[in-house]
Regions:
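Noncatalytic partner-interaction/assembly domains of nucleic-acid and motor enzyme complexes
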Residues: 1-102
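Interdomain "pre-motor" coupling segment immediately N-terminal to P-loop NTPase/helicase cores
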Residues: 83-133
């Protein structure tokens, strides 16, 4: 089943117009799955460094050379990269609108979780006064 996360990753690799429009607003923390987050971070690093979209091959090479991942992690992340398929028929406006909603929903969710962590006293760096009133 295709998810918005996988669709986003696929389009970030194969659709330059989409990538230029949405990449500045997407954060790694929006990806709940660690393997998808790693793929996103590699795409983001590549675009920042080369001002171009990465190919699946360049992503595979970059991921394979990471020293912070064990072999099992690398294998899972490379599987995600291999499964990325750009959908040439996807409606651009729908794609951007759906991605914007995904980003907003994840940002709100993450803020709520962070607030609960602070209220529960599990955040050692911030107390309840860190939550805006």
């Amino acid at each position: 089943m295709q998810t918005i996360e996988r669709t986003t990753l696929s389009e970030l690799v194969g659709n330059e117009q989409y990538a230029r429009k949405v990449l500045p607003f997407i954060r790694g923390e929006y990806f709940g799955d660690r393997t998808e987050r790693i793929v996103f971070e590699e795409i983001q690093k590549f675009v920042e460094k080369y001002n171009a979209l990465p190919t699946k091959s360049s992503l595979e090479i970059e991921i394979d050379s990471r020293r912070d991942l064990n072999e099992d992690d690398i294998r899972r992340v490379l599987t995600v990269v291999k499964e990325l398929e750009n959908d040439k028929d996807v409606n651009f406006d729908w794609l951007v609108e759906t991605t914007e909603k995904f980003c907003k929903d994840k940002a709100v969710y993450n803020a709520i979780v962070e607030g609960i962590t602070i209220i529960d006293g599990k955040d050692k760096a911030r107390g309840p006064d860190a939550i805006p009133s």
